[in-house]
Amino acid sequence: MRKLVYYVGTTLDGYIAGPGGEFDFFPLSDQMTASMNERYPETVPTHIRPHVGMGNPPNRVFDTVLMGRGSYEPARSVGVSSPYAHLRQYVVSTTLPDIDDPAVNLVRTDPSAKIQELKTEEGQDIWLCGGGILAGELLPEIDELIVKRYPVIAGAGIPMIAGTFEPILFTPTANEVFDNGASVTWLKRNS
């Protein structure tokens, strides 16, 4: 069965973006970018690939992406309606007008039911791209986490997971530290 994997970058205090959705304050490094792009090339948006010297590598882990409106809007705001054309794309939103691109599927209700349906299909894993509100709604469905933790404190912003108090244990399976002080931790949900 396919897994839902929340692959996300966060501050030390648990924010994936600033209050206005900004994320340009994360300290990036060539070492970290190269490592993560090698492992997960499908997470690089299609329109960005030529600018980072990436051709069209095969999808290694994911063949489907699910994102909330806030994660979809940055591409849409620059005229890109299909940011991950190399993946099956689902955008969860109750407020977004219809999407004029047949490659992007709009999910207006019950994202959990959509994930349960997608998990039964053949294929690679499903990448939960964000955001925090959607991750909170889908927390019971999240099987694995890949958390890029950057050495910065934001103080406020969009939390990694917004929801109700519902502790769920995950077990770390690997951790890697990079030259910019950031780390990536891979975690699996406890049974």
Language-model regions, residue ranges each:
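Enzymes that bind and transform nitrogen-containing heteroaromatic metabolites
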Residues: 1-191
